[in-house]
Amino acid sequence: MIRKTLAASCAVLLMAGCNAARQQASPLPPVAPPQTYVEPEQAAANPGSMFNDAEADLMFSDSRARRVGDIVLVKIVENAKAKNKADTTSERDSTNNYTVGAYFGQDSASINPMNPVGAFGGKVGTNALLQTGSKSKLDGKGETKRENTVTATIAARVVRVMPGGLLQVEGARETRVNDETQYIVLSGLVRSRDVASDNSVMSTQLADSRIAYYGKGVLADKQRPGWFSRLMDNLWPF
């Protein structure tokens, strides 16, 4: 009875190991704002002036992002395709025959132990004394292919203004639906003149860009094999 109980317990553990670990539903902390954000210095108020810096932009400039703290809309359109293919074929075939045309003036000999020429066992020059041959062939093929497509829109914040009109932007978005959370994180450099009149910029115009799109939840867990399957893949030598 004890053996049957132990066997049943081991079977249950093995079956449980093939399933992905369940994730407990717990509130996730919101995406933290960029750490490099620096609050711009406020100009001293001038009560005697009709206009101030905060309202001057509405009259003398457009609404495109150009200062620290401004918001710019980044349109993520990433299409990446890569393919590599290699074929190798190598073949070599060689045959070598070595014969003696004459031996001490004789062109033939009979099999006679007392006659050293007879050791050749026949006519001199007709039978090969040494024959070698070799043949080798190699066929190799390899192919890799990868394709990625990401399309999204995210609002990013200007965290730094660099010389030459470069804007360092960072942004993040968190979306949760039925305990499934999706994250989009973006950072990069963009020229202020590349920002369109509607305060948007394409992700292909970002330099040193980093775009991450990942998720956490039930669907993400189902994408991975169980812990026992991963353990066996690491330990199995074949």
Curated annotation (Swiss-Prot):
Coiled coil: none
A Pfam family: FlgH
Compartments it resides in: Cell outer membrane; Bacterial flagellum basal body
Membrane association type: Lipid-anchor
Lipid-carrying residues in chain (N-palmitoyl cysteine): 18
Lipidation feature positions (S-diacylglycerol cysteine): 18
Sorted UniProt keywords: Bacterial flagellum, Cell outer membrane, Lipoprotein, Membrane, Palmitate, Signal
GO BP annotations listed: bacterial-type flagellum-dependent cell motility
Any one GO molecular-function label of the UniProt entry: cytoskeletal motor activity
Any single GO CC term annotated in Swiss-Prot or TrEMBL for this entry: cell outer membrane
Signal peptide: 1-17
Summary of subunit composition and partner proteins: The basal body constitutes a major portion of the flagellar organelle and consists of four rings (L,P,S, and M) mounted on a central rod.
Protein family per UniProt: Belongs to the FlgH family.
The protein's role, per its UniProt record: Assembles around the rod to form the L-ring and probably protects the motor/basal body from shearing forces during rotation.
Name of the protein described by the UniProt record: Flagellar L-ring protein
Species name: Nitratidesulfovibrio vulgaris (strain ATCC 29579 / DSM 644 / CCUG 34227 / NCIMB 8303 / VKM B-1760 / Hildenborough) (Desulfovibrio vulgaris)
